[in-house]
């Protein structure tokens, strides 16, 4: 039994939610999102909350039950508050800057890395060593942050590279003489 799936998803104040067949739509101050629920899962609106139940007791239905509930919860939180992911850059000469709508990264390569920011995502650079990715779609915010981190992930010896804020890098000891 999914313990997460049992809980109905409350529709927050300031957000309008609707269920049309297998599609859940949310509209709030930050924008509009929708999620198409898998056919193995039943979804219905009950007294200001979205209820999610498995269609039957098959393994597929039960495995998609909790995930569907969490995805619906994420679209409600996204249109109300939005999501944010912070990245930190460490290393000599490593820095970031916005160039119009593109993110320009100096990461020790012979060339500048230019990242084209997708629609629906906002990237800010408060400091040259800090990047803030914001948006209403949690999956897209995480994907953009992961793509930026992938250009130069943190290395284990000196910790140089792009890492998530608060990420603990497992350090290795260098060679001994």
UniProtKB/Swiss-Prot annotation:
Organism of origin: Brucella abortus (strain 2308)
Function: This protein binds to the 23S rRNA, and is important in its secondary structure. It is located near the subunit interface in the base of the L7/L12 stalk, and near the tRNA binding site of the peptidyltransferase center.
Disulfide topology: none
Domain of life: Bacteria
Listed GO biological process terms: cytoplasmic translation
One Pfam family this sequence matches: Ribosomal_L6
Similarity annotation: Belongs to the universal ribosomal protein uL6 family.
GO cellular component, one term: cytosolic large ribosomal subunit
Assembly information from the UniProt record: Part of the 50S ribosomal subunit.
GO molecular function: rRNA binding; structural constituent of ribosome
UniProt keywords, alphabetically: Ribonucleoprotein, Ribosomal protein, RNA-binding, rRNA-binding
Name of the molecule in the record: Large ribosomal subunit protein uL6
Entries under HAMAP family matching the protein: Ribosomal_uL6_B
């Amino acid at each position: 039994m999914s313990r997460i799936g049992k809980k109905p998803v409350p529709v927050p104040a300031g957000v309008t939610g609707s269920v049309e067949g297998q599609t859940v739509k949310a509209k709030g101050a930050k924008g509009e999102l929708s999620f198409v629920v898998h056919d193995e899962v039943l979804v219905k609106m009950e007294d200001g909350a979205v209820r999610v139940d498995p269609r039957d007791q098959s393994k597929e239905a039960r495995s998609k039950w909790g995930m569907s509930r969490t995805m619906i919860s994420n679209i409600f939180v996204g249109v109300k508050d939005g999501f944010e992911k912070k990245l930190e850059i460490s290393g000599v000469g490593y820095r970031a800057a916005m160039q119009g709508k593109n993110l320009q990264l100096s990461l020790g390569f012979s060339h500048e890395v230019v990242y084209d920011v997708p629609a629906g995502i906002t990237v800010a650079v408060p400091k040259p060593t800090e990047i803030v990715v914001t948006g209403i779609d949690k999956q897209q915010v995480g994907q953009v942050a992961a793509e930026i981190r992938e250009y130069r992930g943190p290395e284990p010896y000196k910790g140089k590279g792009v890492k998530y804020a608060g990420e603990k890098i497992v350090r290795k000891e260098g060679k001994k003489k």
